Amino acid sequence: MAATVKKTGSKKSKRNVPNGVVHIQSTFNNTIVSITDTSGHVISWSSAGASGFKGARKGTPFAAQTAAEAAARRALDQGMRQIEVLVRGPGAGRETAIRALQVAGLEITLIRDVTPLPHNGCRRPKRRRV
């Protein structure tokens, strides 16, 4: 019988990336934090749902803070020190996620709001009546 070789999962090589860009997409239902290098290749990411929150709790500021801390921890392992922050969306976790990145030890050089605003494009969905 042939000996079975234990196959380990593909290990990402530890890259030394000193500068990067943090994309925070904050909606009313969830917050997604992606950390990329300056050319746009994703180094680490996290979201409120991936951090263990379900349902309505994903939209809370605390869930955004937890997601940002998890993504920042992995980026610091890759050697990241300075970041630019691009925030998109109207959600509750915007400021909390930025604060969590700062507390994690990343130096923020720029904060930019890149929320898409229509110049009167598509018709809005009809108003909810509860």
Curated annotation (Swiss-Prot):
Signal sequence region: none
GO CC annotation, single: ribosome
Gene Ontology BP, a term: translation
Record InterPro entries: Ribosomal_uS11, Ribosomal_uS11_bac-type, Ribosomal_uS11_CS, Ribosomal_uS11_sf
Keywords: Ribonucleoprotein, Ribosomal protein, RNA-binding, rRNA-binding
Pfam families: Ribosomal_S11
Gene Ontology terms for molecular function: rRNA binding; structural constituent of ribosome
Function: Located on the platform of the 30S subunit, it bridges several disparate RNA helices of the 16S rRNA. Forms part of the Shine-Dalgarno cleft in the 70S ribosome.
Family note: Belongs to the universal ribosomal protein uS11 family.
Subunit text: Part of the 30S ribosomal subunit. Interacts with proteins S7 and S18. Binds to IF-3.
NCBIfam families xrefs: PRK05309.1, uS11_bact
Official protein name in the record: Small ribosomal subunit protein uS11
Organism encoding this protein: Prochlorococcus marinus (strain AS9601)
